[in-house]
């Protein structure tokens, strides 16, 4: 019996229209997801196109075909990373890194200690004003100052200020992580904190002996803004790597271009003749050898991981090196200004003003060239203004605890963050401790202290670019390169502890007993920092689950800056207890060595697999929640239509039965 192929009446095929024009209730979940996935990127005009964008060469056409053109969410920017976008990323490192080298690691602690000392008295009688630290005699006692009713050593004033600033910074970073991951806020927040931080640094020009507490407040504001902006900058790095043309090409299998091959240009009889002349057996290849060579298999997961890690490390190293070059140039200018102004407090304030101006001016290219790269928007909860901002902050803190729970499932993330917690604290504490040691114990003048940072920055440039060459030469993995840097880093506190050996102390040299000894140690510190800054950031970026960059980099920043609350505080307590800085080298020696075992056990390939699985589970969970929400809304809408049409509710109808 033949099947009935007659068309059914239209009334039997069409679904009854719902009243009140509720078009969305009649759409399937698939249709809605298709609408979301096919939304175009209309968030901003494309002002980042280079002059080569219009080039219609075959190479560009092939690259265009490999673009990930299907957006993941409304406003998703899936364009390949452009050269101008990379320059914008480097530009902000060029602008802001000067604050770290010339400001927080050099002249800010010097200025804070100087201002505190000008307001301090000797602990021996608590009446005699303290002299300048660069001319202090060995027989002088401790210099103390009262801050909010607390008696602290003037050398500890800067350490405690740094601790407060990084605590505030950690709290702020958590609060903004949600806005960075969701919506078109990543770039906006980056620029906002850049302007706030740079203007705060310029405001040091107004700080005097009478309002030195305001100088500490500016330190908190500027350091907090810098840290928040760099968290946002770091969250761009995985996106720049993911959409880099080299990575896109590695992820897509290459197929033969038959239109440009010899199949198209050869006469038909020659092609057939060649095929007929070739004996065909069970083991014959499907393609002719010369045609099969045109096929390129898709890169393996390990090869893609290696490619992304190499690219991430290179971009990160260039960013660090670019920032170091800028800081080196500006530091030399600042030293010249200090010498011309006779190493006065006014000279220190002027150079900090110059640092703020530099930060402001060179943020402009980053603002012009860096693409926003929006994340998926949050669900509209109907809140506006301040309430919407509070909702974002609350969601960010909830996300932090959720991110911590997710990170606990990633072994390599846990190992890295634990090691980075200690290592970043050691980096920050060693820098500030060394500057204060040189100023208060070795009595070095401000221009000489500035030379310490010139040497460390110069060495940092070679370290940023040289460690990649070293790792290739010795075939070192990223975590192995970090371990080598840690081993060199350990030499700094150990050298300071040599001053406790009686025979070294009798020599009067070595063990940080002479000012010139600070310079070779500064070179070691710079080389180490140049490697750690680039490799740690890129290694962590490869372990982050895709789609959670800002949230996990917020956790990275909390681990980084949050740990720096402890180091300076402990060193400050040691100074208050002993009256000298040298005992702090015992603490630094332990702090530098602890991260090594944790870094040793990191496996990047395993970490990327676990991160990808976690990202997939998060996506599946979100899709399932959306499906359930859409199904529920559609059922409620259909039920409402039915009730309006029949004049009674389902419950009433059941009750009537």
Swiss-Prot record:
Source species: Gibberella zeae (strain ATCC MYA-4620 / CBS 123657 / FGSC 9075 / NRRL 31084 / PH-1)
Family according to the record: Belongs to the ATG22 family.
Species lineage: Eukaryota, Fungi, Dikarya, Ascomycota, Pezizomycotina
Subcellular localization: Vacuole membrane
GO cellular component: vacuolar membrane
Record keywords, A-Z: Amino-acid transport, Autophagy, Glycoprotein, Membrane, Transmembrane, Transmembrane helix, Transport, Vacuole
Gene: ATG22
Side of membrane Vacuolar, spans: 113-155, 209-212, 339-349, 406-409, 468-481, 537-554, 605-657
Domain of life: Eukaryota
Record note on disruption phenotype: Significantly decreases the radial growth of colonies under nutrient-rich conditions.
Compositional bias segments (type: Basic and acidic residues): 632-657
Glycosylation sites: 343
Protein name: Autophagy-related protein 22
